[in-house]
């Protein structure tokens, strides 16, 4: 079967078919193996990819710039504060400026595609970032790639499973533990949602652990449940920090995320609350109860809070491998959606 994704937006892996996910992963692995060869280095020749950052980053900006360069193109950094864009607050205009409709259509004339990064600190309500990204995609006739919004992070999800497959092969039937952890960063849901969605799509058993009061949005939990049901796999939830670490778990993902009331109480109150729950940490004692599990994390890691140094820097940590894979999965996305590469699976 040949997979053609030319012109497709990539907003969330749940909106891709499993065949499209597998095609992207196949190409990313091929690109990683032939990184410095000539096979792919002219795919974006003389083309510009725009990177629109409402929020800062380390891995995302550098990996997208490197991806465009290695495909023969150029990535241009944009910030909203340098552009005269219209701003609204809960539907009320607070700053006059250009509408998304107008800005998006103009940007599409200049570029082969655009990535957008807009997290919770740039919006007032959960889902607003994703809605803004989709509004740009609506008005642009070139591919829009989600570089992380307040709901989803498809590039991270693809990179997670690529690293997991590299170390343990086919993921079907294997078990992952996604566990909340305390910390000082008040993190959004995007990477957590994406990992839960893509691992359940690819046939994994999923365990989810979090303290009471840190439930994930029900709409995303419903999708994970449906994915597991469709694959005949298990989905379990616990509110015990120890219960998820069992002898069938082959991957552990410990990460902080904020509570459902974050937008009401604010970042400082959220950090004060979360920092008290010190039992919620991934340590070696807990990892020893698993099936020699690998430790994964999207980074940046809040060491000593989300995970101990012993685990994060230990032999079973694949966090740096996954971070590298951001480059390769993003090259694959750009190659298929922008350059129009077709992949046989």
Descriptions of predicted regions:
Residues 38, 42-50, 56-165, 303:
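Phosphate/diphosphate ligand-binding glycine-rich loop within oxidoreductases
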Residues 43-49, 172-174, 292:
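Phosphate-coordination loops involved in phosphoryl transfer and adenosine-cofactor binding
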Residues 54-72, 165-255, 260-261:
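Glycine-rich phosphate/diphosphate-binding loop of Rossmann-like nucleotide-binding domains
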Residues 125-146, 264-290, 315-316:
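A short, gly/pro- and small-residue-rich
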Residues 226-310:
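Rossmann-like adenosine-cofactor binding region
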Residues 292-294, 298-345:
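Adenosine-phosphate binding glycine-rich loop
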């Amino acid at each position: 079967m040949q997979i053609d994704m030319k012109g497709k937006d990539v907003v969330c892996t749940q909106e891709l078919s499993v065949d499209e996910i597998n095609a992207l992963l196949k190409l990313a692995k091929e690109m990683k193996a032939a990184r410095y060869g000539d096979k792919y280095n002219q795919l974006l020749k003389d083309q510009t990819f725009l990177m629109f950052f409402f929020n800062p980053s380390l891995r995302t900006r550098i990996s997208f710039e490197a991806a465009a360069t290695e495909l023969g193109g150029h990535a241009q950094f944009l910030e909203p504060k340098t552009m005269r864009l219209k701003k609204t607050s809960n539907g009320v205009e607070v700053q006059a400026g250009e509408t998304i409709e107008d800005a998006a259509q103009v940007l599409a004339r200049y570029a082969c595609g655009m990535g957008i990064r807009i997290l919770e600190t740039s919006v007032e309500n959960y889902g607003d970032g994703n809605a803004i990204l989709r509004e740009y995609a609506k008005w642009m006739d070139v591919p829009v790639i989600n570089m992380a919004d307040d709901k989803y992070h498809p590039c991270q999800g693809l990179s997670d499973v690529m690293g997991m497959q590299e170390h343990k092969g086919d993921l079907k039937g294997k078990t992952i533990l996604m566990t909340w952890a305390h910390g000082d960063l008040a993190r959004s849901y995007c990477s957590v949602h994406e990992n839960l969605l893509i691992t359940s799509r690819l046939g994994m058993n999923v365990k989810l652990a979090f303290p009471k009061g840190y439930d994930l949005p029900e709409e995303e939990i419903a999708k994970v449940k449906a994915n597991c049901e469709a694959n005949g796999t298990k989905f379990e939830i616990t509110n015990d920090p120890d219960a998820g670490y069992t002898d069938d778990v082959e991957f552990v993902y410990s990460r902080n995320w904020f509570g459902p009331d974050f937008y009401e109480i604010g970042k400082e109150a959220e950090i004060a609350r979360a920092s008290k729950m010190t039992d919620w940490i991934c340590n070696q004692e807990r990892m020893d109860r698993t099936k020699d599990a690998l430790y994964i994390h999207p980074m940046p890691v809040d060491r000593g809070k989300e995970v101990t140094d012993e685990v994060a820097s230990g032999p079973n940590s694949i966090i740096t491998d996954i971070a590298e894979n951001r480059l390769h999965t993003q090259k694959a996305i750009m190659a298929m959606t922008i350059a129009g590469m077709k992949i046989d699976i």
